[in-house]
Curated annotation (Swiss-Prot):
GO cellular component term, pick one: plasma membrane
Protein name: Protein BIG GRAIN 1-like A
Superkingdom to which the source organism belongs: Eukaryota
Skewed-composition ranges (Low complexity): 88-104, 112-127, 208-223
Family: Belongs to the BIG GRAIN 1 (BG1) plant protein family.
Native organism: Arabidopsis thaliana
Location within or outside the cell: Cell membrane
Residue pairs linked by disulfide bridges in the UniProt entry: none
Species lineage: Eukaryota, Viridiplantae, Streptophyta, Embryophyta, Tracheophyta
Signal peptide: none
Length: 357
């Protein structure tokens, strides 16, 4: 058996092998003697692989300081933006040469807290602050202020032009402005205590029919509102009034209409009377239908009597004026229509004219 003394592969790990270890290695190699020795190409490949790995490690060591410098530059840019924003928001005129003590401490703290590079790249250059960005921002700020003032002046001009635009003229508005101008002139001239304003009310012509349709006109109500300065402010208000005119009735505006309470009371009374008239008409129709039912059942047993009542007219079959006291409307006996008609609107119209006149 031929014994060959070879240098073990793990020479880097075992610098000084012992005699027992070398003996054991030779025994193991003799046992595996059937396998051929490793070729030279495999050894070259291993060496080439080790060289590539060492080169990649060296490149990583060179690239890591570059990444670290980039992170430091990003932190520096972020801190610079924060300081610029704080300076512009507070509008302070402090000098722009270098960092303050708190800013430099925070900057060094961030650089220390970042990933530690190898010993060769721990010494880092100090950042240099330039004022070029500050000058550009200082130039842009007055431009923005000038644009804001320009837009504000344009908005004020447009608002003043809108105020000068004339409102559409209406007769009611012209009358209201005229009355208000009279009252303001009276307030400015204290010597003239007595001023009388007359409001003309145009009467509508009488219609040729029995009852004209409802005509509406405007009634000016002058109200005084006390103010804190002691002077009285007057305002004009127009209220619609519905009036029913007859042929024989002439409309005159009483003085009581100037009082709003009296007008409300008259309106309430008129509504109440109208409601009572409608209720009476309903009761009258109800009694008529009941009577008609009774007469139809007994019509075969009752003989006609032409001389029954000489005072009755053609419509006495519909309305018997003698029996109106039973339903409580005896007072409306004279106003009820008894001339060949059963229309309720005519009856209500005649009753309403009787109440108003």
């Amino acid at each position: 058996m031929e014994i060959t003394w070879e240098k073990p592969k793990s020479s880097s790990h075992h610098r000084n092998p012992s005699f027992s270890s070398t003996l054991l290695d030779q025994i193991y190699r003799s046992i595996d003697d059937s396998s051929p020795p490793p070729p030279l190409e495999s050894i070259k490949k291993k060496k080439h692989h080790h060289q590539q790995r060492n080169a990649s490690l060296h490149e990583d060591r060179e690239i890591s300081p570059i990444y670290h410098r980039r992170s430091i530059a990003a932190d520096f840019e972020r801190s610079r933006r924060k300081t610029d924003f704080l300076r512009h928001s507070n509008s302070s005129s402090s000098d722009s040469s270098g960092f303050s003590s708190s800013e430099s401490d925070s900057f060094h703290g961030r650089s220390k807290s970042s990933a530690s590079p190898p010993s060769s790249s721990r010494q880092q250059p100090k950042p240099i602050r330039t004022s070029s960005v500050d000058h550009s921002s200082a130039v842009q700020k007055p431009k923005e202020l000038g644009g804001f003032l320009r837009t504000k002046s344009k908005a004020l001009k447009i608002y003043s032009d809108l105020k000068k635009v004339k409102q559409p003229i209406s007769p009611g508005g012209r009358l209201a402005t005229f009355l208000n101008s009279l009252f303001t002139n009276a307030a400015t001239n204290p010597k003239k205590h007595k001023k009388t304003t007359t409001v003309a009310v145009v009467e509508e012509p009488h219609s040729s029919s029995t009852c004209s349709s409802a005509s509406s006109f405007s009634r000016s109500c002058l109200s005084k509102t006390p103010s804190s300065s002691g002077k009285s402010k007057r305002s004009v208000r127009f209220c619609p009034v519905n009036v029913i005119l007859d042929e024989d009735s002439s409309f005159t505006m009483p003085y009581a209409y100037n009082n709003e309470r009296l007008y409300d009371n008259n309106e309430a009374k008129r509504v109440e009377e109208h409601r009572r008239v409608i209720q009476a008409a309903k009761d009258l129709l109800r009694t008529y239908h009941n009577k008609n039912k009774v007469t139809t059942t007994n019509i075969n047993n009752v003989e006609e009597d032409d001389e029954d009542d000489a005072a009755s007219c053609a419509s006495s079959d519909l309305f018997e004026l003698e029996n109106l006291s039973a339903i409580g409307i005896e007072r409306y006996r004279e106003e009820l229509p008894v001339y060949e008609t059963t229309r309720l609107d005519n009856m209500n119209r005649v009753i309403a004219t009787g109440l108003i006149v």
